[in-house]
Amino acid sequence: MNISVFDMYRIGIGPSSSHTVGPMRAGRNFISLLRSQHLFPEVEGIKVKLMGSLAATGIGHATDSAVLLGLMGKSPSVIDVDSIPDWIKDIKDKNRLLLDSCKPISFTYSKDLTFEPSVLDSYHTNTLIISAFDAKGSELFSRKYYSVGGGFIETEEEAKLKQEPRALPATEEDKKALPYPFSTANELMKQCRKNGLSMEAVIRANEEVIRSHEVIDDTLDHIWSVMSMCIDRGLNAKGCLPGPLKVKRRANELYEKLLNSPLKVADDPLQVIDWINAYAFAVSEENAAGGRVVTAPTNGAAGVIPAVINYYRQFIPQANKEGIRTFLLVAGAIGALYKKNASISGAEDG
């Protein structure tokens, strides 16, 4: 199975790719399965069971809300972040879930969504089960999901078949041969030397099996645009992050200090590090606040890639759009190697 660069960069919401984005995708996938099996009209009840790590940190990571939003048909890539609190409040206050945003069913949060942190699945610690019931309370359909890091989800059936994890649904690149296949960094370098190509050229050629050159560039530009907006929001946000600890945001304070500093980078080269830190803090704090971020390759690591790119844009005179695209392609492929040969799930290998 081929892991695309664009599998690694997934637009979603914070605070966690494995505990927020993955569960939301699981809920949305469950709705899709109900529809494909023509069971959707019969559904009058839903139960969600969070297990292992998803249950242990479920409240803090908004895993509970994420699954419900997925069952409402919301996608992490386009969801209206500002509307989330009202949607969740409506579910809890009215004991009603609007399935796929069109079918109201009875749903009592305290009864129909359960947390079982001590129940550990042997395959993966990030486990959830979603079940649908008819008007008589008989089970219509149930599915076990694993959220395996980076927003990727895998069903129990896929795990039994020992398939590699990927985000659902599978895309066409699985079905086509790549011109320059590689599964390790050594194999990537061998392809470069053998064919006289740069890493960017090898990776782009593989991506062009499924996407045109123009679509690749447009998608990379969009990914950077979302990252850039996340930096801007984080740099200008003040106050404390959500949660009982009342952690103070640091990005804005550092940003203002740098803007007002009498010293410039030419006088103090180490100041560049402070700028990079400010950019990374900005993204990380937006992620912690449940804002829109791009997995790179996870939400937890989402600040590094944007910070480096913004450094490149602000401090390298020769910086251009092509350089950003090249960086995203190569970095994404390196992330895919980690996913393919190890893990990007903190709960699994952190």
Whereabouts are the PLM-identified features?
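A structural-propensity feature for long, helix-poor, extended segments
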Residues: 41-80, 84-99, 323-350
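Cysteine-centered functional microenvironments
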Residues: 7-17, 51-52, 290-295, 344-349
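Alpha-helical support elements that line or immediately flank enzyme active sites
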Residues: 20-35, 306-318
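C-terminal regulatory domains involved in ligand/effector binding and gene-expression control
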Residues: 76-264
